[in-house]
């Protein structure tokens, strides 16, 4: 199982780093910060599919 530690999120501003991750919604998030903010917005229903683009 692939996981991302989102304990430090959500953050008001994410850095522009480009390290894509693929969410369970089949959307590519530009980095862990953007993904974790989306997890927070989804009330935990969004999960990580895999690292890299979807």
Swiss-Prot record:
GO cellular component term of the entry, any: extracellular region
Coiled-coil annotated residue ranges, if any: none
Entry's Gene Ontology molecular function annotations: serine-type endopeptidase inhibitor activity
Pfam families the record matches: Kazal_1
Cell compartment(s), UniProt: Secreted
CDD domains: KAZAL_FS
UniProt site (Reactive bond 3): 16-17
Sequence ranges assigned to domain Kazal-like in this UniProt record: 4-54
Disulfide feature: 6-36, 14-33, 22-54
PROSITE patterns documented for this protein: KAZAL_1, KAZAL_2
List of glycosylated residues: 43
Calcium as UniProt keyword: no
The UniProt record lists the keyword Transferase: no
Gene3D superfamilies xrefs: 3.30.60.30
Protein keywords: Disulfide bond, Glycoprotein, Protease inhibitor, Repeat, Secreted, Serine protease inhibitor
PANTHER family per the UniProt record, alphabetical: OVOMUCOID-LIKE-RELATED, SERINE PEPTIDASE INHIBITOR, KAZAL TYPE 2, TANDEM DUPLICATE 1-RELATED
Domain observations: Avian ovomucoid consists of three homologous, tandem Kazal family inhibitory domains.
Protein name as annotated: Ovomucoid
Organism: Nycticorax nycticorax
């Amino acid at each position: 199982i692939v996981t991302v530690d989102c304990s430090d999120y959500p953050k008001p501003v994410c850095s522009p780093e480009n390290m894509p991750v693929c969410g369970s919604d089949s959307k590519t998030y530009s980095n862990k910060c953007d993904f974790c903010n989306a997890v927070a917005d989804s009330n935990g229903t969004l999960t990580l599919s895999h690292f890299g683009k979807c």
